[in-house]
């Protein structure tokens, strides 16, 4: 399983709407997922040379909380704190690799991983009664607000969620990953932590996603400039494994009628082979990859 499909599979097992897309019993799914991908609290990405990453740890925490598995939640949290929470702030290094002298080859964070970790910790305290996790959730949320937001070059009062604390930003041009915008998590964390900027980032993020949908293309990465959207300098400009999460997060945030959900449905057209959906394409509509993996087809069924 690749890094992105691991994320997709985790999310597809974690929401009531997406559980309905599967025939198996959800608790059995969780146990199978845990046995396959979790080792002593480490969520393993087997097809990426066994690395672990902050997104996987965040989703693992969210799954464990959603299924009421306190033991697994504690183990995933403990591993995360010991191995990824190594920065001077409350954010995580995004990647851990086994069998290396330096297990952390890149100390930069990935904001979506921090967002989901904080949200899982918040839910653990608020919804599961594991209240000792609440304080950590609020501290992470405050550092996301402090370090991972930047003004939209077109509207200074519209905060953009950055892909990382050290991500490229300037007054005239800001790099974003639209799939990092998870409105529900941003709003709940902002309200709990007393950080209105996170709530504003959710609101403005939905506006940005609607603007992207109006262009007819939802990219993995895009630059926001004073003149509008532009191809990013560092990344390919395409619909792909990152952007697949946009409709998932909007649906999870009760925004099923959002224009980006409708746009994503048009992107996820049928592939050339039966049962396959398009998961990677260019702005011109050239299909680069299609897949029949359960997570991707579940998203397609969800938004159709």
PLM feature spans:
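Substrate-binding cleft of extracellular glycoside hydrolase catalytic domains
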Residues: 91-143
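Charged catalytic carboxylate motif
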Residues: 59, 72, 116, 136, ...
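Extended ligand-binding clefts on enzyme/binding-domain cores
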Residues: 24, 28, 50-54, 108-112, ...
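Short glycine/serine- and small hydrophobic-enriched flexible loop segments
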Residues: 61-66, 116-126, 184-191, 248-252
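N-terminal carbohydrate-binding/catalytic regions of secreted carbohydrate-active enzymes
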Residues: 27-111
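N-terminal export signals
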Residues: 5-23
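Alpha-helical solenoid scaffolds that mediate protein-protein interactions
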Residues: 33, 67, 80-83, 87, ...
């Amino acid at each position: 399983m690749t890094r992105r499909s691991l994320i997709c599979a985790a999310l597809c097992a974690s929401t009531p709407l997406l559980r309905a897309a599967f025939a198996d019993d959800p608790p059995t799914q969780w146990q199978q997922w845990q046995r396959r991908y979790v080792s002593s609290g480490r969520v393993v990405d087997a097809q990426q040379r066994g690395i672990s990453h902050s997104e996987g740890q965040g989703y693992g925490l969210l799954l464990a909380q959603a299924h009421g598995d306190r033991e697994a939640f504690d183990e995933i949290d403990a591993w995360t704190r010991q191995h990824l929470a190594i920065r001077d702030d409350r954010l995580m290094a995004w990647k851990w690799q086994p069998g290396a002298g330096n297990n952390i080859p890149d100390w930069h964070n990935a904001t979506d991983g921090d967002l989901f970790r904080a949200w899982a910790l918040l839910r653990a305290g608020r919804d599961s009664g594991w209240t000792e996790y609440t304080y950590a959730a609020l501290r992470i949320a405050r550092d996301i607000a402090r370090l991972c937001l930047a003004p939209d070059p077109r509207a200074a009062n519209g905060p953009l969620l950055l892909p990382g604390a050290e991500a490229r930003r300037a007054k005239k041009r800001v790099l974003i990953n639209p799939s990092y915008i998870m409105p529900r998590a941003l709003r709940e964390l902002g309200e709990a932590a007393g950080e209105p900027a996170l709530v504003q980032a959710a609101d403005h993020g939905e506006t940005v996603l609607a603007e992207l949908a109006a262009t007819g293309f939802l990219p993995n990465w895009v630059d926001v400039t004073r003149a509008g959207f532009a191809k990013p300098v560092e990344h390919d400009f395409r619909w792909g494994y990152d952007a697949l999460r946009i409709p998932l997060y909007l649906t999870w945030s009760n925004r099923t009628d959002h224009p980006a959900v409708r746009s994503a449905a048009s992107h996820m057209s049928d592939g050339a082979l039966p049962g396959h959906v398009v998961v990677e394409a260019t702005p011109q509509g050239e299909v680069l990859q299609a897949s029949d993996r359960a997570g991707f087809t579940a998203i397609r069924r969800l938004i159709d």
